[in-house]
């Protein structure tokens, strides 16, 4: 699971309870990176998933922001390939677009389709 996250984290827990991910990676802005490093440690123990990476984008509101989001997404995928379990078929990739900015949601949707995953949005935590 890859979650695009902004300042509010409640929807992340709803995502874990609905999809029971093997692992979780978070993409956020530099403003929230430290917060999600701590929360991902806590959540991985509480919800029994493998802790992934917290990738952050420093140029979120600049013209290069989308390129940085793409790089962060592929950093998470690469980490998953290097550290995930060996299997005969890849797991279904869930990409959460509830948090963050509109261009994070659009980029996440596009990348989920390219990677063969599915996109979800949490209406209410």
Label each PLM-derived region with a short phrase.
Residues 30, 98-99:
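Short histidine/acidic/glycine/proline-rich micro-motifs that form metal-
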Residues 1-92, 106-125:
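Long, low-complexity, Lys/Arg-enriched
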């Amino acid at each position: 699971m890859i979650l695009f996250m902004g300042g509010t984290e409640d929807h992340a827990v709803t995502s874990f309870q609905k999809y029971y991910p093997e692992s979780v990676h978070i993409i956020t802005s530099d403003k929230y990176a430290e917060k999600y490093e701590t929360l991902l440690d806590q959540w991985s123990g509480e919800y029994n998933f493998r802790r992934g990476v917290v990738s952050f984008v420093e140029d979120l509101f600049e013209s290069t922001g989308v390129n940085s989001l793409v790089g962060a997404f592929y950093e998470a995928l690469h980490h998953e390939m290097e550290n995930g379990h060996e299997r005969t078929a890849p797991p279904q990739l869930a990409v959460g677009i509830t948090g963050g900015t509109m261009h994070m949601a659009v980029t996440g949707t596009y990348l989920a389709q390219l990677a063969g995953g599915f996109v979800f949005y949490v209406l209410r935590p």
